[in-house]
């Protein structure tokens, strides 16, 4: 097996003119630009593309997080011979910069010291424009997640509008969508051979802009940018056409008119076969961030992946809110056992390896092969059909034996103490396996105290719109997990990922979920609101209010208050959420749940707040601040001056939160009566 020795690589690719000259280079062939700090690890797209081009014999420089106020950083190496390959980063720059509430984030795990601000908003577009400004005559190939998900006209959550393809906005010559290795190598070879970029229009896995007279002979067309920006039904229909043509076997060329020109999406590139994946992951990565970041606090994103191994790509899970099916695709491919074991063996020789491999996984850890034989001949099913939801397809091939053999080999390596699985297990696929050997060994050897799983919700309607299996499947998995953990003598826990406000999720659904969590003694710490990122079916539903496969209306919670109520219900047990939880339960006429879901501490706080609101006068000032004054009932007129008010500490004029006295503690008997009143409120109705 090539590169199966214990060699640890230490040489980074050039990041400056001085690095070039140290290698004796006068000119680079290509510059690879990335939105993340330079981390030479195969979990980072910039590292894969730059090492792949290096392996093809090209002179490569890496321009990581260039200064974006002008184009001078793009001239750092001098003019490259053939062009630029640009990516926005591992995470969409807008998701990296803003929370789902559109609040700016201060942190960025992919930047030096974990600090935000090192990349611009919409970094893929900004970097492309700067490269074109620096060298207008050089080709720019734009790839990566951010570009892939914006290749068609798309709804932009942050501007709350529909934008044209990133090909139009950025000015890139070619958009490379998907994982990109095949496209990168072919484009580089053709540019190096002297072919003009304008004629490179037939590469699978790429998009380009052209005029009507130069469209390909055969294609399927979806509604254009102006149409989908003004007609939500047209947007939903276009979404279905795009999703139905992302398979390498059954997909067709898709055309969509933008402002003036037409976007042409060629069929997706073929996934890398096993030996090709092995080759990519055997490239000489240093597996660490560049030393220039050491004094800045390093790059936090390396912590979890430095001693993790990617064993597969693609996911046939088909979650509607997930970007993987539009980027990596639904066909699963995987590396050979020898390749994975060789990478693990190399890790054991690294100086800071402590014996723990954090993960052997991928988009879904326990997928190793395509979901069925039919897809190899006819392609993946279209029309919104899922391999695993609402039930497991009868054609599904369920087999964990190959994955299990790999885990056994790695955990037997000298120097390896534990091998964990942290990238997520698809529990419905696991439960479909009649052989529970993998499940037993998962519990025995590969859980680091907690196992991440993603039921996401429990309401049937919401799960259907998510593309997730019914909650009964998760219940069976949960019961078996704890049963096997008990037999193994281990105290281990499930960490369920849950989502609020997904299209289709009503307030009643959120209350149903809170009741489910209470009855199952679950207190999730990791919850999130649905984040409408470009390129997903769920985002289409969020924007249009329609199911793109049926065109039937879908309820979408878009108000800030409604979203806050749904999120609070997921963490009903937190006293800080008491007011929102009580309000939600009253709105849904489920007051019977108040004494169960709302802690006594939270109920008392809500009662005190209500009493204060009833016994206070509020004056709102012109600057938006307000003053709270006690309502002196029976002690003078409402127009009584401040000087005549009772002695004591007075609210500061204009204070946003005026001080108030702490109420005296009630006798225990009175408090018990109040608690009893909460519990019997439903009966009194």
Locate the predicted segments by residue.
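N-terminal [4Fe-4S]-dependent radical SAM core
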Residues: 2-27, 37, 236-308
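Glycine-rich beta-alpha loop elements in corrinoid/cobalamin-binding modules
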Residues: 19, 45, 64-258, 265-266
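Conserved SAM/AdoMet-binding glycine-rich loop
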Residues: 32, 48, 67-68, 346-495, ...
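N-terminal pre-triad scaffold of radical SAM enzymes
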Residues: 36, 296-323, 348, 356
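Terminal amphipathic helices with adjacent charged low-complexity linkers/tails
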Residues: 69, 198-247, 260, 269-272, ...
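Flexible glycine/acidic-rich beta-alpha junction loops that bind and position SAM and/or redox cofactors
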Residues: 92-101, 149-151, 181-186, 210-214, ...
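Conserved, mostly hydrophobic/aromatic
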Residues: 173, 280, 315, 340, ...
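Intrinsically disordered, Lys/Arg-rich low-complexity segments
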Residues: 609-614, 618-685
């Amino acid at each position: 097996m090539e590169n199966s020795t214990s060699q640890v690589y230490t040489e980074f690719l050039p990041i400056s003119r001085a690095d070039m000259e140290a290698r004796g280079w006068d000119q680079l062939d290509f510059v690879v630009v990335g939105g993340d700090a330079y981390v030479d690890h195969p979990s980072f797209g910039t590292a894969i593309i730059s090492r792949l081009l290096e392996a093809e014999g090209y002179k490569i420089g890496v321009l990581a997080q260039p200064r974006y106020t002008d184009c001078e950083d793009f001239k750092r190496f001098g003019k490259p011979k053939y062009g630029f390959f640009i990516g926005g980063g591992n995470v969409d720059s807008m998701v990296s910069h803003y929370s789902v509430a559109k609040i700016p984030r201060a942190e960025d795990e992919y930047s030096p010291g974990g600090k935000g601000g090192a990349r611009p908003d919409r970094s893929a577009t900004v970097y492309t424009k700067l490269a074109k400004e620096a060298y207008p005559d050089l080709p720019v190939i734009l790839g990566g997640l951010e570009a892939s998900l914006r290749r068609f006209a798309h709804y932009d959550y942050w501007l709350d509008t529909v934008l044209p393809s990133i090909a139009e906005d950025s000015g890139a010559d070619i958009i490379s969508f998907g994982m990109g290795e095949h496209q990168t190598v072919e484009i580089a070879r053709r540019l190096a051979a002297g072919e003009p970029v304008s004629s490179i229009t037939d590469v699978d896995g790429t998009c380009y802009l052209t005029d009507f007279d130069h469209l390909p002979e055969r294609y399927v067309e979806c509604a254009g940018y102006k149409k989908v920006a003004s007609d939500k039904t047209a947007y939903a229909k276009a979404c279905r056409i795009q999703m139905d043509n992302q398979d390498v076997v059954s997909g067709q060329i898709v055309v969509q008119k933008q402002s003036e020109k037409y976007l042409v999406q060629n069929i997706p590139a073929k996934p890398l076969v096993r030996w090709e994946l092995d080759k990519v992951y055997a490239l000489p990565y240093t597996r660490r961030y560049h030393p220039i970041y050491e004094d800045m606090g390093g790059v936090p994103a390396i912590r979890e992946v430095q001693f993790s191994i990617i064993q597969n790509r693609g996911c046939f899970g088909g979650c509607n809110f997930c970007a993987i099916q539009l980027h990596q695709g639904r066909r699963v491919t995987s590396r050979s056992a020898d390749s994975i074991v060789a990478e693990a063996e190399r890790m054991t020789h690294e100086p800071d390896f402590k014996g723990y491999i954090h993960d052997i996984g991928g988009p879904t850890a326990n997928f190793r092969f395509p979901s069925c034989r039919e897809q190899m001949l006819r392609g993946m099913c279209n029309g919104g059909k899922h391999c695993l939801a609402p039930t497991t397809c009868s054609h599904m091939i369920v087999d964990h034996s190959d994955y299990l053999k790999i885990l056994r080999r790695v955990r037997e390596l000298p120097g390896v103490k534990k091998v964990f699985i942290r990238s997520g297990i698809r529990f419905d696929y696991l439960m479909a396996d009649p052989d529970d050997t993998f499940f037993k060994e998962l519990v025995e050897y590969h859980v680091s105290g907690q196992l991440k799983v993603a039921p996401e919700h429990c309401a049937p309607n919401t799960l259907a719109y998510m593309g997730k299996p019914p909650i009964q499947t998760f219940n069976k998995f949960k019961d078996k997990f704890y049963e096997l953990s008990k037999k193994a003598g281990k105290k281990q826990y499930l960490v369920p990922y849950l989502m609020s406000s997904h299209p289709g999720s009503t307030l009643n659904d959120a209350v149903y979920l809170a009741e489910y969590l209470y009855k199952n003694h679950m207190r999730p710490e990791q919850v999130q609101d649905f984040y409408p990122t470009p390129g997903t079916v769920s985002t289409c539903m969020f924007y249009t209010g329609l199911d793109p496969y049926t065109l039937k209306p879908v309820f979408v919670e878009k108000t800030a208050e409604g979203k806050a109520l749904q999120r609070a219900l997921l963490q009903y047990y937190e006293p800080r959420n008491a007011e929102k939880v009580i309000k939600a339960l009253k709105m849904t006429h489920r007051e019977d749940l108040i004494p169960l879901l709302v802690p006594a501490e939270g109920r008392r706080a809500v009662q005190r707040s209500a009493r204060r609101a009833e016994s206070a006068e509020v004056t709102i000032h012109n600057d938006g601040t307000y003053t709270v004054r006690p309502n002196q009932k029976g002690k003078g007129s409402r127009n009584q001056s401040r000087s005549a008010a009772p002695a004591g500490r007075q609210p500061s004029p204009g204070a946003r939160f005026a001080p108030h006295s702490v109420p005296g503690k009630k006798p225990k008997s009175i408090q018990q009566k109040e608690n009893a009143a909460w519990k019997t409120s439903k009966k009194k109705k």
